[in-house]
Amino acid sequence: MSTPAIIDIFRSSGALLEGHFKLTSGLHSNTYFQCAKVLQHPEYLTEICRNIASAFSDVTIDMVISPAVGGIVVGTETGRQLGVKTIFSERKNGEMVLRRGFTLSPEEKVLIVEDVITTGGSVAEVIDIVTKAGAIVAGVGSVVDRSNGKVTLAEKQFSLLCLEVKNYDPDTCPLCAENLPLDAPGSRSLTTS
């Protein structure tokens, strides 16, 4: 899929938003990719995940893991296309953990799949879970990389849409200086106790 084609899919799905947003990372931006609005369409979900799975066809993968909430749908479909189990991590008291009986085995080769990467914070937390279990990070795949490839999380990494989007520290955000209303559509605040 070409970059213009992917951007067209986001636009036609109402998933490429402009305004003043607080991202899951805590940074602010004038652009937000609401992947859920794209991934709700089976034809887009299938094609996007086919591209992610294809990017890792030369790597042995035993399992796919995704951070909740945004990565679950794309991770599950990517795992289905690869023919491997899929699990997800989630926050408990602010910490990314495995729950629901999910486990990783030593030496298991794991592909981490996320919807959007900005700073890579959530994926880094999942990498920590994987390595502490003695499993091996086989790669990181995502739908969108807002850093234009500047955030390196694994030796093998693939993003379907890789572009640089302006992000601002909240203390120096020009959108805040203009008193524009702040929208926080991300899922970081969704935690389980």
Curated annotation (Swiss-Prot):
Domain of life: Bacteria
Record-listed E.C. numbers: 2.4.2.10
InterPro entries the UniProt entry points to: OPRT, Orotate_PRibTrfase_bac, PRibTrfase_dom, PRTase-like
Annotated pathway: Pyrimidine metabolism; UMP biosynthesis via de novo pathway; UMP from orotate: step 1/2
Cofactor(s) the protein requires to work: Mg(2+)
Keywords of the record: Glycosyltransferase, Magnesium, Pyrimidine biosynthesis, Transferase
Binding site for 5-phospho-alpha-D-ribose 1-diphosphate: 114-122
SUPFAM superfamilies: PRTase-like
A single MF term (Gene Ontology): orotate phosphoribosyltransferase activity
GO biological process, one term: 'de novo' UMP biosynthetic process
Gene3D superfamilies given in the database record: 3.40.50.2020
Chain residues that bind orotate: 118, 146
Catalytic activity annotation: orotidine 5'-phosphate + diphosphate = orotate + 5-phospho-alpha-D-ribose 1-diphosphate
Group of enzyme by EC: transferase
Role: Catalyzes the transfer of a ribosyl phosphate group from 5-phosphoribose 1-diphosphate to orotate, leading to the formation of orotidine monophosphate (OMP).
Subunit structure as annotated in this protein's UniProt entry: Homodimer.
Family: Belongs to the purine/pyrimidine phosphoribosyltransferase family. PyrE subfamily.
Protein's UniProt name: Orotate phosphoribosyltransferase
Provenance organism: Chlorobium phaeobacteroides (strain BS1)
